[in-house]
Amino acid sequence: MCFNKFTGSRGKSGSNDANAEFMARCRAVMVEGQVKFQTAELGKVNQGGGGTIAYICALYGMNVIDSGVAVLSMHAPWEIISKADLYESARAYKAFALNA
């Protein structure tokens, strides 16, 4: 499972940033469920791309974080993921559904 704490470009336009307490809760759920996870960032600063709807949900006051399977070369002719990452992502979503 890969967590992305913040997204956006051009300053704060169309961006979101998970607060420390929400990040801590997400990490705690993963630790309690013995799920392996990592954090990442979404591409280069101010380059755009990497679309997400998290910022829209954040506009309504929701705590948001982007999460998913780590992918190498997304949108390329051959995207690559690890079977272990896919398995841990499934376990992470289950842990979150049961404990959050």
PLM region descriptions:
Residues 1-78:
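Active-site-adjacent substrate-binding region
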Residues 69-100:
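His/Asp/Glu-rich mid-to-C-terminal helical/loop segments that flank catalytic regions of hydrolases
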